[in-house]
From Swiss-Prot, chains A, B:
Catalytic activity entry: isopentenyl diphosphate + (2E)-geranyl diphosphate = (2E,6E)-farnesyl diphosphate + diphosphate
UniProt cofactor note: Binds 2 Mg(2+) ions per subunit.
Entry keyword Transferase: yes
Names of required cofactors: Mg(2+)
Protein name: Farnesyl diphosphate synthase
Main enzyme class: transferase
Lineage start: Bacteria, Bacillati, Bacillota, Bacilli, Bacillales
Length: 297, 297
């Protein structure tokens, strides 16, 4: 794909994800306030990087990305639930997310907890409902298994728990990497891995794509830490320097700003190399990789 | 089964569930405090009525209940997560559960939220991991789909959200029944339905067992409300009359105590009738039904 058509592809897919997410909430028969709270955070915007990784991987393997749409939405629901719960007063106690009041600020803590619980549970339902002809039962089961592992007590939840436990302590680089590999890495990796499963990647492609995603995940987090120091407040939608003032371990704090930038470049290069080795139509994935390296919010 | 062997069967199954639950947590590679928080509430006791309903239904259909054990544990994990989240300060704000300090009292709010999130996610993983030979992929997918529906934003989470919204308001009987059918009913019904799926029930048996479970679920809740008035504090492990003092809608409040007892008897009889109509070896299910009618905690 040419650069222009890559951008167009990603814009179209992002739109498809956002339309599908809204429909999935609309069709629910449940208390109105619960639906509103779930929709509020799902529709609060964001880069939709996880669904786009999945859909771009499916596309890179020559399959119709529409087949992966429900799984892409499931991933975004789980990502969104994690943001809602992370923002709670007893967790990170954030009032703003993407420049808007956080879920509990609008709907109250109880409803925010329930909206998160609802999104997490609903995500699994979406994958079960896909037609057997589009994704066979055994592959859907594998998709659910890997999603639960990526999101659960050996994945994202483990990362968040380690993050909570590490607050106020001086972390080593390996402890910091444990947190990031779990808190954000596992779900980013899952996004690509699920795309490989849906797209029918062979063993070698799957291995290279998994490596691509692992490096991309670390790059993503390092960039996040750098942005916290360099980014403009209005662009990232939260107070700049909040990590420093919260005394949180970050890559720049452990490696210096220059060292963090070097590490970012290393992981981006490694990601691009593994992507090339995967021998897929990876233009959209390469473009996402560039966006992560250069993103300013 | 004779009465004695029924009691023995249920005790053995309860033991099997508790052993399996502990093993499932032990095997996790994750932060120690997260595992402790998850295990604490899982191991806090309770009647294990949901897993026992599932395993007794599998047994009633002539199959080995061991086949259903991972699904029984998944149900108990989801039930336990819901208790942890319901007890949080922003929800019911309970300090005691089964006579022991609630999860957030011991591990803090953040870890309690994460323990709940972890249990919910892990529950789905357990079902995916069952061998194809024991439960085929298409049935496992159905089990996951129904579990997500029973627990999610059209099931248990909807009931809890409606309950939160109804606090301090005067509810009608139909609003109260909506809350109970969702908050506790859906998961009790799922327990029997999952047993029917695993045990290979035919359409008529499934229908009768579903009806059995629906009536049992309502009976369970009515008995709970009656206990809140009549029960001894040390037996139920929370202050007696807490519903009244919290101004919560209950069956006795809406129907009088005598009216509630009449309704309890009606649902127990209907449950037993549907169980007989299912033409299964239902001794253990009938016994659980009697326990619900007579339970004093």
């Amino acid at each position: 794909m040419a650069q222009l058509s890559v951008e167009q592809f990603l814009n179209e897919q992002k739109q498809a994800v956002e339309t599908a997410l809204s429909r999935y909430i609309e069709r629910l028969e449940g208390p109105a306030k619960l639906k509103k709270a779930m929709a509020y955070s799902l529709e609060a915007g964001g880069k939709r990087i996880r669904p786009l990784l999945l859909l771009s991987t499916v596309r890179a393997l020559g399959k119709d990305p529409a087949v992966g749409l429900p799984v892409a939405c499931a991933i975004e629901m789980i990502h969104t639930y994690s943001l809602i719960h992370d923002d709670l007063p007893s967790m990170d106690n954030d009032d703003l997310r993407r420049g808007k009041p956080t879920n509990h600020k609008v709907f109250g803590e109880a409803m925010a907890i329930l909206a998160g619980d609802g999104l997490l549970t609903y995500a699994f339902q979406l994958i079960t409902e896909i037609d057997d002809e589009r994704i066979p039962p055994s592959v859907r089961l594998r998709l659910i298994e890997r999603l639960a592992k990526a999101a659960g007590p050996e994945g994202m939840v483990a990362g968040q728990a380690a993050d909570m436990e590490g607050e106020g302590k001086t972390l080593t680089l390996s402890e910091l990497e444990y947190i990031h590999r779990h808190k954000t890495g596992k779900m980013l990796q899952y996004s690509v891995h699920a795309g490989a499963l849906i797209g029918g990647a062979d063993a070698r492609q799957t291995r290279e794509l998994d490596e691509f995603a692992a490096h991309l995940g670390l790059a993503f987090q390092i960039r996040d830490d750098i942005l916290d120091i360099e980014g403009a407040e209005e662009k990232i939608g939260k107070p700049v320097g909040s990590d420093q003032s919260n005394n949180k371990a970050t890559y720049p704090a452990l490696l210096s700003l220059a060292g963090a930038k070097e590490k970012l470049a290393f992981h981006i290069e490694a990601a691009q190399r593994h992507l090339r080795n995967a021998d897929v139509d990876g233009a959209a994935l390469a473009y996402i990789c560039e966006l992560v390296a250069a993103r300013d919010h």
